[in-house]
């Protein structure tokens, strides 16, 4: 089967989607249900570009050996979740230098005050007070370059990245106002039915791979038995008699368990409420633990299949980077001409 040319790809009718994940920690079941599973569903209807954003990862100090391992782990997880290199462009950010090249130019069209207002910079600065570096401050501009260099139409974003996407739109519109229609202005993609998985011990906050309390987190690569134990210890509430019902305000812990079970089994929340009517919270926890541990076991089998084949992983990275570079260079050439750089002889 012949690969489409760059011009054929760019002229396709499918909207272009870009998204990525950092290889800086273990991906969680929250990442899977909220993002990766949505990415898989989008592959047939969108022109999908999925990146492993290793350059973003080093805004926080990384062990080099561990970063290389986690980059390959993340790629294998992408594949295990169902992201298909025949349908999507999959690559590692540092393999495509056009991201960093465009990022520098966009820095010159981004204001200090805009970056100062980014809440994620404030949060990360507080957590990493010993290493408040320029890259951490400038992170949203590299994210903007990641998006704009592919003429992205839609970006799947969570609440924590919504402010960054708004900045990306502002930068694109500002640049276009000066130089003409150079960039597509990206829109947020709001997935339907994507569960927002919350922390098991603190169900009013989102599950995060960087959470210091590991009892809050279910990693995709952790021992399924460990995951089951965490679920059985998850916070519920003290309602008497116990009622298994979905109520984010009054019953965040129970609602989170129902979201998890719905996400894994495909059942609706009303179906699950009916199924557990009159039952104790322990019954719900056992059902969630069994479903999640079963899902993790199957996912990890697929992960190890891909992770143990580094020849295949290297091939996918090389082919993905080649496709991404060709597409990114088209945009970069337009930008270079617009700002007045002399074409490379």
Swiss-Prot record:
Alphabetic keyword roster: Aminoacyl-tRNA synthetase, ATP-binding, Cytoplasm, Ligase, Nucleotide-binding, Protein biosynthesis
Summarize where L-tryptophan binds, as residue positions.
146
GO biological processes? tryptophanyl-tRNA aminoacylation
**Main location per UniProt?**
cytoplasm
What are the disulphide bonds in this sequence? Answer: none
Q: Might you give the EC number(s) for this enzyme?
A: 6.1.1.2
Q: Name one GO molecular function term.
A: ATP binding
- Got a GO cellular component term for this one? cytosol
Motif placement: 'HIGH' region = 23-31
**Record InterPro entries:** aa-tRNA-synth_I_CS (IPR001412), aa-tRNA-synth_Ic (IPR002305), Rossmann-like_a/b/a_fold (IPR014729), Trp-tRNA-ligase (IPR002306), Trp-tRNA-ligase_bac-type (IPR024109), Trp-tRNA_synthetase (IPR050203)
EC main group: ligase
> Subunit composition?
Homodimer.
Q: What is this protein called?
A: Tryptophan--tRNA ligase
Please report the organism this UniProt entry assigns to the protein. Photorhabdus laumondii subsp. laumondii (strain DSM 15139 / CIP 105565 / TT01) (Photorhabdus luminescens subsp. laumondii)
């Amino acid at each position: 089967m012949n690969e489409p040319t760059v011009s054929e790809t760019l002229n396709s009718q499918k909207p272009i989607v870009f998204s990525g994940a950092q290889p800086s920690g273990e991906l969680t079941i929250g990442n899977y249900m909220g993002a990766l599973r949505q990415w898989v569903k989008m592959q047939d209807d969108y022109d999908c570009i999925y990146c492993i954003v290793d350059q973003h990862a080093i805004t926080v100090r990384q062990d080099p050996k561990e970063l290389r391992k986690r980059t390959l782990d993340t790629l294998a997880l992408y594949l295990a979740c169902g992201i298909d290199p025949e349908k999507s462009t999959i690559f590692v950010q540092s393999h495509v230098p056009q991201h960093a090249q465009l990022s520098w130019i966009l820095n010159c069209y981004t204001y200090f005050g805009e970056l100062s207002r980014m809440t994620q910079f404030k949060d990360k600065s507080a957590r990493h007070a010993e290493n408040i570096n320029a890259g951490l401050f400038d992170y949203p501009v590299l994210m903007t370059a990641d998006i704009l260099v592919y003429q992205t139409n839609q970006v799947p974003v969570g609440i924590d990245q919504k402010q960054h996407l708004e900045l990306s739109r502002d930068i694109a519109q500002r640049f276009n106002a000066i130089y003409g229609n150079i960039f597509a202005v990206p829109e947020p993609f709001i997935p339907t039915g994507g569960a927002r998985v919350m922390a098991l011990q603190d169900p009013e906050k989102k599950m995060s791979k960087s959470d210091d309390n590991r009892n809050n987190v279910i990693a995709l690569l952790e021992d399924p038995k460990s995951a089951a134990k965490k679920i059985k210890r998850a916070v519920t509430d003290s309602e008497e008699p116990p009622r298994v019902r979905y109520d984010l305000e009054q019953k965040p812990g129970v609602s989170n368990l129902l979201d998890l079970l719905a996400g894994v089994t495909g059942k609706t929340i009303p179906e699950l409420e009916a199924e557990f009517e009159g039952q104790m919270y322990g019954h719900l926890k056992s059902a969630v633990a069994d479903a999640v541990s079963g899902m993790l076991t199957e996912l990890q089998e697929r992960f190890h299949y891909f992770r143990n084949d580094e020849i295949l992983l290297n091939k996918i990275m090389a082919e993905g980077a080649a496709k991404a570079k060709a597409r990114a260079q088209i945009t970069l050439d337009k930008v270079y001409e617009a700002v007045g750089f002399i074409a490379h002889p």
